[in-house]
């Protein structure tokens, strides 16, 4: 009743709504789905994989419709949209699915790994560390989460700051040992990414978690230039 005076648009996937996504395809590179915009069904493709991406796209479509934006412009915009460091796929010559995500808490790591696990046909390879001079209690928890969900985990550094990087990875390792998860420890993050890329195929998905959009890595209290997108491209050459 509180909304009856207002012009409300609902959107959804499973439940009845004004704007509904149907015939959804989720791959490790994109999602696509059908949705009615104005008076006809349109096929929408979004270069951010995951079911959550469908919901976000539907919300954007609802707003764009209210603003009178044409279906053609909506389709083009959703195809091109990228959010730096959030489920961001890195284009590369090897055509390996490599995703950069800012996940740096137990909850966010669990969310991204579960999301990619649901649609990846091959292995999910998780590469992550934990920040230094921050809550050390979450380190074994994140190790346990990755060990439970990912097919293979490479424990590495994030921003060690003033802490010993080895001590941080040891604490993460305590958690992963509670699981049956396959893993290895590679303290140097660039070397860890190289290891992940060596073992991956085009069916797999590598999740580089924690750094996201940050352009630096902080070691011994000093910030060094570090952009994960550039690192991936430099490794491939």
Across the structure, where does each feature detected by a protein language model lie?
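ATP-dependent carboxylate-amine ligase
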Residues: 2-7, 29, 38-39, 49, ...
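Short beta-strand elements of ligand-binding domains
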Residues: 9-14
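A short catalytic or substrate-binding loop motif that flags glycine-/basic-rich loops and adjacent residues
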Residues: 15, 25-27, 81
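A residue-level signal for beta-strand positions that form part of recognition/binding surfaces
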Residues: 18
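Acidic-glycine-rich active-site phosphate/pyrophosphate-binding loop
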Residues: 24-43
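A short glycine-threonine-serine/GTX helix/turn-capping micro-motif
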Residues: 43-51
């Amino acid at each position: 009743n509180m909304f009856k005076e207002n012009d409300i648009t609902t959107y959804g996937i499973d439940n009845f709504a004004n704007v509904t996504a149907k015939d959804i395809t989720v791959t490790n590179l994109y999602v696509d789905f059908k949705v009615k915009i104005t008076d006809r069904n349109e096929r929408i493709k979004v270069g951010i994989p995951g079911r959550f991406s469908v919901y976000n796209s539907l919300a954007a479509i609802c707003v764009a419709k209210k603003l009178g934006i044409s279906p053609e412009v909506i389709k083009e915009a959703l195809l091109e949209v990228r959010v730096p460091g959030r489920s961001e796929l890195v284009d590369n010559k090897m055509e390996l699915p490599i995703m950069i995500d800012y996940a740096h808490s137990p909850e966010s790591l669990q969310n991204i790994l579960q999301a990619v696990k649901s649609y990846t046909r091959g292995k999910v390879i998780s590469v992550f560390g934990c920040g230094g001079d921050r809550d050390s209690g979450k380190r074994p928890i994140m190790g346990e989460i990755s060990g439970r969900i990912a097919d293979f985990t490479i424990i590495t550094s994030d921003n060690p700051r003033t802490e010993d990087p080895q001590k941080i990875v040891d604490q993460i390792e305590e958690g992963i040992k509670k699981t049956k998860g396959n893993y290895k420890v590679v303290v140097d993050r660039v070397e860890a990414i190289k290891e992940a890329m060596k073992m991956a195929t085009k069916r797999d998905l590598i999740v580089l978690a924690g750094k996201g959009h940050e352009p630096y890595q902080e070691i011994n209290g000093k910030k060094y230039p570090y952009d994960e997108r550039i690192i991936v491209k430099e490794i491939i050459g």
